[in-house]
Amino acid sequence: MIRLFAFTVSVLIFAATSQAQERPPIFQQMFKDYGFESFGQIEKIRYTFNIEGLLSRTWEWEPKTDLITYEGKDKDGAPVKLTYPRSQLSSQSDLVKNEIDPAFSNDNYWLLFVLRVSWDGSATITDEGMQKLPLGNGSAQRVVVKYPSEGGYAPGDTWELYVGGDHRIQEFVYHGGGSGTQKRPKLLVATWAEYKKAGPLLISTDHRGTADGTPARVFLSDVSVKVTGSDSWMNAQ
């Protein structure tokens, strides 16, 4: 599975291995609080991923079938709207394989970071206890997520998650691994704010901070879900 995480126009790709790692108790609780136990109710998720002043990408995803609909632009700025099954990715066009699907993986991690890290299973997760917040006042429990030094497009990437007493991420610091085939920030520091519930899912919709010292903002808009037994979209609120 290819995993991505972007803050600039460049795409930041997670390392990939299949070995599951033990999770500390705090991360296991976060996994539940962010919606794991009810994720099976989700039939469709719709959202727009935005990097302020740079781009917007709109997605509709059916988790049970892995059917994806994308609306946005390609790397040259041409409008694109298409639907494809991820189960048949190898037979898709170069546009889908090289641009659209990597963008989906990236944006979906921003949407469901805690769940994606847990499902993936390759990262080492460590509870480092209470630490000073990198941006705000006070302190929070620092949980470090580190990907393997080999394998994937961006090996060795590390995330420091600053988690409050409510098990919600408040801020994070990203350290780029430095190797791999994709360009990405060396240092990214940002908030994890504007939490909303979309059905059973807990989602942070606003991230403000700096990428390699430059002000940056990533935010999610128009988030909604359809759950089993309902034909109506439930807007995040």
Predicted feature locations:
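Tryptophan-centric aromatic hotspots in well-structured domains and transmembrane helices
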Residues: F39, W61-P63, W110, W159, ...
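N-terminal mature ectodomain segment of secretory-pathway/periplasmic proteins
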Residues: R23-N98, W119-G121, T126-Q131
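Sec/Tat signal peptide C-region and signal peptidase I cleavage site
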Residues: A16-A20
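Bacterial N-terminal signal peptides
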Residues: A6-A15
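Flexible, processing/modification-adjacent segments and terminal tails
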Residues: Q21-Q28, L82-P155, G180-R184, A236-Q237
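Gly/Pro-enriched, hydrophobic low-complexity segments
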Residues: N137-N235
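Positively charged n-region of N-terminal signal peptides that target proteins for export
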Residues: M1-L4
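A general structural signal for short secondary-structure boundary/capping elements
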Residues: E60-E62, S91-V96, R116-W119, L188-W192, ...
